[in-house]
Amino acid sequence: MITETAHAKINLTLWVGRKRPDGYHSIDSVMHSISLSDEITLEKSNEILLTILEGDAPAGQENLMVRAAEAFFAVTELEGGVFLTLKKRIPSGAGMGGGSSDAAAVLRGLSKAYDHPLSKEDLLKVAAKIGADVPFCVEGGASRCQGIGEILTLARAWEGLPLVIAMPPLFMP
């Protein structure tokens, strides 16, 4: 069994450009991982199954963790599946990359479980197909993110920076 930590992220800066033909917006953002996190366990299985142990998250195909596992097995052409558990602490709809970080954790965990069948570059390409924030969440830390979020330039982390994050009672899908 493998345990992965899925850290929330915040946007320290964010510029949003025009909507692209693929439905995404061009962005230029500085993203930073924070200590708030979800916990994911992965265990090899014959099928892809997700159990939510704590918190609120979509199940089945609506969950980015399931999509990440499906994408990993499709690209690697490996037989099998994974039993996933989720302890959800990152609030849904808060813009903190909860679903994206969970998907990234699944990609990292599957890569470890199956002895790294994809290069880092290929893993990031799979991540970009799942969602715009997923490549950053695979890497974590601090990065300038451009394109739709898939073009990463490492930045210096702001360790120890005290932050107060308030979440109003609004949900942003």
Language-model segments: which ranges?
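N-terminal beta-alpha supersecondary unit
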Residues: I2-E79
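ATP-dependent small-molecule kinase catalytic core of the GHMP/sugar-kinase superfamily
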Residues: I2-T5, N11-W15, K19-S29, H116-P173
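Solvent-exposed beta-strand sheet faces enriched in polar/charged residues
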Residues: T13, E43, T51-L53, F83-K87, ...
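Short pre-catalytic strand/loop immediately N-terminal to key active-site residues, enriched for Gly-Thr
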Residues: D28, V82-G95
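DPxDG-like acidic metal-binding loop motif
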Residues: M65, A94-K120, F136-V138
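Phosphate-handling active-site elements
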Residues: F73-T85, G109-I130
